[in-house]
């Protein structure tokens, strides 16, 4: 299990970049699935949700739609990929 926060952040950023290349719209539920598959400690998920898209937003690769999606009873911010 991956418990190192920096390593988990790097995995989350890579997952977000891959998702942005392959989908027009994305939310954190997609990233969370990848984190589960990668073996990241669930205790890190909440912090990663807040940071994994920041770099892509800052670089102009994503746009915040201002909308939310609901997956399994949780709501997530919806982003539009500008590199899809």
Label each region the model flagged.
Residues 42-58:
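Short amphipathic alpha-helical interaction segments
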Residues 67-84:
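Short, cationic-aromatic polyanion-contact patches
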Residues 13, 28-29, 33, 50, ...:
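Short amphipathic alpha-helical segments
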Residues 1-25:
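Short alpha-helical segments that sit at the start of domains
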Residues 22-39:
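Short acidic, hydrophobic short linear motifs in intrinsically disordered regions
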Residues 57-68:
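A short, conserved structural fragment
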């Amino acid at each position: 299990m991956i418990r190192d926060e920096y390593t988990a952040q790097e995995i989350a950023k890579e997952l977000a970049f891959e998702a942005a290349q392959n989908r027009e719209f994305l939310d954190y539920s997609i990233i969370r699935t990848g984190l589960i598959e990668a073996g990241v400690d669930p205790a890190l998920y909440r912090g990663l949700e807040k940071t994994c898209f920041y770099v892509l937003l800052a670089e102009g690769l994503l746009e915040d739609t201002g909308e939310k999606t609901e997956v399994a009873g949780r709501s997530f911010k919806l982003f539009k990929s500008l590199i899809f």
